[in-house]
Structure formats: structure tokens, C-alpha cells
């Protein structure tokens, strides 16, 4: 069972209306009980859950507001009369509430900016004031302080949103069931005749097993509560006492039975039909039946419709004639249609009594076909774009290879030129010098060589000049 406590009960209910029951003085017990450790409030599923929780936590610290809340009735809370008491809370509490609102406005602005950035082009000026108007749980005209109008809007919005939570759950389950049936029919169409008959036989066998189980009692009836009293509480069924039963199952001792505490009472009945160890049993169907059972009890027992069952409401329900009627058991009918607390016909599971009509299934299949066609078209476009990118990549790779080949050829030619201009060293490392061909004398032809030799022979020898006499010797 999920955690429950004063704040846990609060967040399962539509608004601050629940605070009155949460803060009520607990029933006297024979022996004092140790205080249960504080548990975190379960998530309501609202996108402003944290803001709602923090506002309530702050308001709980103010003695004046707490006193007015205990004296208020449901109409005072829903009409906004309680919200006006915010003007009399302490300055310290108002300061905390102002800071909470500024943080919430900042958070919503960030969400809006992220959303707009994902949908629009950059550099577009946003009108945050108009955008904040789509959030109905705060006053967008005043973005800095928490006023009575903010508390009123928070109560109204949470009341509406949480009241629609069960309806949204039923709609989600309906779509889940239609998708299952759609896939089952498509699977049967893909089979041969013999295989299809075998699959249909297995389905009929599964449905037959669901019909063969112990009787499921009407939720909230004497028979159902006595079974819990005997099998879960281990007490004598002949000594059943409604007040004692209420106290035993008020787990957090806050004087009321919240939705989670009520749903825990139906586990024994649901286990008669659904076995978690059996793969053929759909646990989502079991939880849908649990929700329907809780709605049925709330409709017949919760007279002020605050989604809490007080001791007075519980005891009053046990005085009705229907409380002792046995009938044939609980009928599991269409999802979201609570049945009256009265004798009903034989049990029908969700599989035997679908949560949808054939017309709804037809429209759902048309919606799936349109979505599938859209996805196929998108997949085809992506495939074509992928092929185009592949071809472009191939061309780029070819150009890259050509460029690399050209660079390689240029390097080779450069190396060849350098090796031609620079002689290679000899075996002992010395350079081999090759004289320039322009400085080497060209030998004359053989005939000319004789003339050259003869001319050399005809050259007369030069006679030495006579010595000159010095003038001093004369």
C-alpha cells in the first residue's frame, strides 16, 4: 500500500478542502500510539504538485489559519471564503508564500521559454504575461506576492484537475484495451485457418477460467467487510464491529479513510479473479477494477463528496438496507461506470464486458491507420534523405581520394627533382664531384691534331737578350 499520512490523504483529494479532515483531532484510542514517521506525500500527478504541497506546508504552520480551517465547511472552502483568511496570517508566513509564488512564476517562465525555443525561431520576443495566463493555478497579473486570489485559484484548479483524474485514467485504460483488441485481430488475420481456430480456442479457455472463481462481494457491503475482518484482520466474523473495523483500517489515525486506505480493502476480492503469477491475467485490468470499486464506495458512502470517508459517513452506510444484501456478487462492468450498491447479476470481467463499443474501436483503428500512414510517409522521406546523403558522401569521398592522389604525385615529383640536383655520397661518405662539362677541353679531330703538332714544332726558340751594362761600369 502506498504511503499515507495527513499530507498523503490531502494530496489524494481535490483541494485544501481535505485539510479540515487532515487537521481534525484524531479519535481517542485506549492506549497512546507512537507517532508514525513522517512520509512523503504521494504525487498527485498535477504539474504544479510541488507548488501545491509547499503552499499547504507553509499554511499548516500558521495557527490562525489552522483554526479557521478546522471550523470551515466544504462550501466555505469551495466558495473562496476561507481564502480571505489569508489576510490575517502572520507576516512570516506571507513572506514565505510570496517567495514560493515567485519561484513558481520563474519555473513556469523557464518551461515556456524552453517550449517556445523548441517551436519557434530564435530572437523572437515573448509576451510572458499572456503566456502565463494559460496556467490557471495562480494569478498572472501579480507575479510577486501571494494573495487571497492565488489561494482561491489554487483550490479551484486542484479541485477540478483531481476530479478529472479518474476520468482520464478510464480513458487511458479504454485506449489500452482497444489497442490490445486491435493487435489481437490483426494477429488472427495473419494466421492460417487452423492456427486461427486454435488461437480463438485458447482465448475462450482463458475467458472460461476468469468466470470460474469464488464469488466477488460488492465493495463496501457487509459480506465484503466481514471477509476482510476475518481473513486479513484475523478476527471472529460473528463479532464484526463497524467502528472497530474503521479504526483498524485508518492506518494513519487521522480519523478518515482516504482513497488508498479504501483501495487496500479490495485486494482480497481482486485476488479471486486476478493472479499476479498467471501471465494470462492482465494486471492493468485488475487496477482498473480496483479503481471502479473505490469509485463505487465513494459514490455511496462519501456523502459530502470530499473524497474522504469519515467515521460518521462509514457508520451511516452500514445502516442502509443495501449493506446487508448479499446478491450474487460484484459485476465488473464498463470502465468508469460505477454500479449502485445493490444485488447485481453474475460477474463479468473486463474481457467479457469491454470498456469500449465497436464504433469506438472502429474510430480508434482509423486513427491508428492514419498515424501509421503518416509515420510511413515520414520514414520514406527519411530514407530518401538518407540515400541522398549517402550519395553526397560518396562524391565527397571520391573527391577526397583524388585530392590525396594529386598531393602524392606532387610530392613524388618534388623528391625526384631534389635527388637530381643533389649528388649522392660515395661509399665512404665523400661526395662525388662531376666536373662541369663546359670547362673540359674538347679533343680535336685526328687530322687537325697533326697540324697542331706541326705548328708547335715550327715555333722558334726565343734567344736570350744580351745583358745591359750598368752606367757605372763605363
Curated annotation (Swiss-Prot):
Alphabetically ordered keywords of this record: Calcium, Coiled coil, Cytoplasm, DNA-binding, Golgi apparatus, Guanine-nucleotide releasing factor, Membrane, Metal-binding, Phosphoprotein, Repeat, Secreted, Signal
Region Disordered, annotated ranges: 190-218, 382-474
Coiled coil: 147-215, 355-422
Single annotated GO MF: guanyl-nucleotide exchange factor activity
Pfam families membership: NUCB1_N
Binds to GNAI2 and GNAI3 as annotated region, ranges: 225-318
InterPro entries in UniProt: EF-hand-dom_pair (IPR011992), EF_Hand_1_Ca_BS (IPR018247), EF_hand_dom (IPR002048), Nucleobindin (IPR040250)
Membrane topology: Peripheral membrane protein
Motif (GBA): 300-330
Entry text on domains: The EF-hand domains are unfolded in the absence of Ca(2+) and fold upon Ca(2+) addition. The GBA (G-alpha binding and activating) motif mediates binding to the alpha subunits of guanine nucleotide-binding proteins (G proteins).
Protein name in UniProt: Nucleobindin-1
Record organism: Bos taurus
Amino acid at each position: 500500500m502506498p504511503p499515507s499520512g495527513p499530507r498523503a490523504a490531502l494530496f489524494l483529494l481535490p483541494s485544501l478542502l481535505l485539510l479540515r479532515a487532515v487537521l481534525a483531532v484524531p479519535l481517542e484510542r485506549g492506549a497512546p500510539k507512537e507517532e508514525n514517521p513522517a512520509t512523503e506525500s504521494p504525487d498527485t500527478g498535477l504539474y504544479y504538485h510541488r507548488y501545491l504541497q509547499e503552499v499547504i506546508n507553509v499554511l499548516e504552520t500558521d495557527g490562525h489559519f489552522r483554526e479557521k480551517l478546522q471550523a470551515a465547511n466544504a462550501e466555505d472552502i469551495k466558495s473562496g471564503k476561507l481564502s480571505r483568511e489569508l489576510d490575517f496570517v502572520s507576516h512570516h508566513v506571507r513572506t514565505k508564500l510570496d517567495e514560493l509564488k515567485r519561484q513558481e512564476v520563474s519555473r513556469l517562465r523557464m518551461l515556456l521559454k524552453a517550449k517556445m525555443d523548441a517551436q519557434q525561431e530564435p530572437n523572437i520576443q515573448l509576451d510572458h504575461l499572456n503566456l502565463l495566463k494559460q496556467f490557471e493555478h495562480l494569478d498572472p497579473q501579480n507575479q510577486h506576492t501571494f494573495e487571497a486570489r492565488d489561494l482561491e485559484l489554487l483550490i479551484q484548479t486542484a479541485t477540478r484537475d483531481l476530479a478529472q483524474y479518474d476520468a482520464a485514467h478510464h480513458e487511458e485504460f479504454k485506449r489500452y484495451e482497444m489497442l490490445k483488441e486491435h493487435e489481437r485481430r490483426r494477429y488472427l488475420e495473419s494466421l492460417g485457418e487452423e492456427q486461427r481456430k486454435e488461437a480463438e480456442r485458447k482465448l475462450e479457455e482463458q475467458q472460461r477460467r476468469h468466470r470460474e472463481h469464488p464469488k466477488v462481494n460488492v465493495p463496501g457491503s457487509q459480506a465484503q467487510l466481514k471477509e476482510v475482518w476475518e481473513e486479513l484482520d484475523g478476527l471472529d466474523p460473528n463479532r464484526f464491529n463497524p467502528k472497530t473495523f474503521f479504526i483498524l483500517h485508518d492506518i494513519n489515525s487521522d480519523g478518515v479513510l482516504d482513497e488508498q486506505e479504501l483501495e487496500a480493502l479490495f485486494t482480497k476480492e481482486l485476488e479471486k479473479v486476478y493472479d499476479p503469477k498467471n501471465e494470462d491475467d492482465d494486471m492493468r485490468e485488475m487496477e482498473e477494477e480496483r479503481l471502479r470499486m473505490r469509485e463505487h464506495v465513494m459514490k455511496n458512502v462519501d456523502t459530502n463528496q470530499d473524497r474522504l470517508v469519515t467515521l460518521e459517513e462509514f457508520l451511516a452506510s452500514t445502516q442502509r438496507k443495501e449493506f446487508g444484501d448479499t446478491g450474487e456478487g460484484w459485476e465488473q462492468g464498463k470502465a468508469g461506470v460505477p454500479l449502485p450498491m445493490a444485488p447485481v447479476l453474475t460477474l463479468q470481467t473486463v474481457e467479457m464486458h469491454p470498456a469500449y463499443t465497436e464504433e469506438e474501436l472502429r474510430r480508434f483503428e482509423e486513427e491508428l491507420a492514419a498515424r501509421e500512414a503518416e509515420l510511413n510517409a515520414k520514414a520514406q522521406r527519411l530514407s530518401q534523405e538518407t540515400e541522398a546523403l549517402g550519395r553526397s558522401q560518396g562524391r565527397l569521398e571520391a573527391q577526397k581520394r583524388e585530392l590525396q592522389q594529386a598531393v602524392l604525385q606532387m610530392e613524388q615529383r618534388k623528391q625526384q627533382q631534389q635527388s637530381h640536383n643533389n649528388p649522392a655520397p660515395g661509399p665512404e661518405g665523400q661526395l662525388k664531384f662531376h666536373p662541369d662539362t663546359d670547362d673540359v677541353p674538347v679533343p680535336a679531330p685526328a687530322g687537325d691534331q697533326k697540324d697542331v703538332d706541326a705548328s708547335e714544332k715550327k715555333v722558334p726558340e726565343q734567344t736570350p737578350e744580351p745583358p745591359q751594362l750598368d752606367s757605372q761600369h763605363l
